[in-house]
């Protein structure tokens, strides 16, 4: 049975990525696309690379007939999603790609996002969307909150190590490089080609990046006690991709074994042989995560390197993976695309 899909916020990067992936999905059909500022336009006018697809025109959200929609992807800006989702039909399944429902604690949300949540009852209802760790909850959920792309990358590298008890929880450092599409499509001076190309810089450093809220929440939940990591992201002049270098204290072989054992049966998680390290070029445009482990010259220390595509596995691909579970479909449906190379 084909499921009818609406994409709210289809004129942004994650919205366009949803369209690209769903176009070849065997059990999903796009029946509505919203883009309030571009209402009335064809998707091919906004994204010429989608010209070959037969898609509905963009419209305003309040013009969509949700009685004909089985599931909606909400790819709207942070803070906008909570207001829009609050007004949607209560029986509608929703996957939200914003940050609005990732943190379960209203106080934590206010700490990291600077203002109270406008829909705290939905915040508590939402299921955190790191698919491989919340499958059962996602299957029965009405509202799923997509993770932050940086937060997903770091968690894939670290969660199994906390679960297996093979690292020092008080000494975890994440050094992360992110592609520019993670900053969204709106015009920003620091994202202009002349400002960004041929250089890289740290941003939201010193423990201020909002994805730290997700790390705190998830790692502390697993450990049963507060866990805080050091995290510094860097913006790099590539369109897609995230590479996280995670420095931990623990036996390198035990670290590698914990990751390999945890992801042995996972479709989209690939742990490389010990000593091999991954590259963002090998997962570009795909829903795959590659993870590598090596030892350090300092005994008892290990380096874990994880890579994923921020627009796919870090956002839209993850969202479709979660939607597949919510709709009772094959979890990997529409997502087995090979990476784009070179």
Swiss-Prot record:
**Top-level EC class as recorded in UniProt:** oxidoreductase
- The EC number on file is 1.2.1.38
User: Does the keyword Endoplasmic reticulum feature in the UniProt annotation?
Assistant: no
Q: Which residues form the signal peptide?
A: none
Q: Name one GO biological process term.
A: L-arginine biosynthetic process
Q: Which reaction does it catalyse?
A: N-acetyl-L-glutamate 5-semialdehyde + phosphate + NADP(+) = N-acetyl-L-glutamyl 5-phosphate + NADPH + H(+)
Question: Record's Pfam families?
Answer: Semialdhyde_dh (PF01118), Semialdhyde_dhC_1 (PF22698)
One Gene Ontology term, aspect cellular component? cytoplasm
Report the SS bond pairs.
Answer: none
Superkingdom of the source? Bacteria
What residues sit in the active site?
149
Q: Which InterPro entries match?
A: AGPR_type-1 (IPR000706), NAD(P)-bd_dom_sf (IPR036291), NAGSA_dehydrogenase (IPR050085), Semialdehyde_DH_NAD-bd (IPR000534)
UniProt cross-references to CDD domains, sorted A to Z: AGPR_1_C, AGPR_1_N
What are the transmembrane regions?
A: none
Q: Where in the cell is it found?
A: Cytoplasm
Question: What are the alphabetically sorted keywords of the record?
Answer: Amino-acid biosynthesis, Arginine biosynthesis, Cytoplasm, NADP, Oxidoreductase
Task: Show the NCBIfam families listed in the entry.
Answer: argC (TIGR01850)
Q: What does this protein do?
A: Catalyzes the NADPH-dependent reduction of N-acetyl-5-glutamyl phosphate to yield N-acetyl-L-glutamate 5-semialdehyde.
Q: Which HAMAP family match?
A: ArgC_type1
What family, per the record? Answer: Belongs to the NAGSA dehydrogenase family. Type 1 subfamily.
**Designated name of the protein:** N-acetyl-gamma-glutamyl-phosphate reductase
Source species of the chain: Cereibacter sphaeroides (strain ATCC 17025 / ATH 2.4.3) (Rhodobacter sphaeroides)
